[in-house]
Curated annotation (Swiss-Prot):
The gene is infA. GO terms for molecular function: ribosome binding; rRNA binding; translation initiation factor activity. This is Translation initiation factor IF-1. Keywords: Cytoplasm, Initiation factor, Protein biosynthesis, RNA-binding, rRNA-binding. It comes from the Bacteria. It comes from Borreliella afzelii (strain PKo).
């Protein structure tokens, strides 16, 4: 088995809330990505609203999509 590729973790600000727990997030480098909530955040009912500062994991294969893994306080 091959070693799983490492995800790129970066910070951003939620700009827009979309249906089905999808969000438009502006990263620190001003790029806009489409991100969904991670499973643990869904399980624990963590709410995300526009303006929240979040940590996003990006796949090294597709840098336009990501997963929100943490919401800053």
């Amino acid at each position: 088995m091959d070693i799983k590729e490492e995800a790129i973790e970066t910070e951003g600000i939620v700009k827009e809330s979309l249906p089905n727990t999808m969000f438009r997030v502006e990263l620190k480098n001003k790029h806009i990505v489409l991100a969904h909530l991670s499973g643990k955040m869904r399980k624990h009912f963590i709410k995300i609203v526009p303006g929240d500062k979040v940590k996003v994991e990006l796949s090294p294969y597709d840098l336009t999509k990501g997963r929100i893994v943490y919401r800053e306080k």
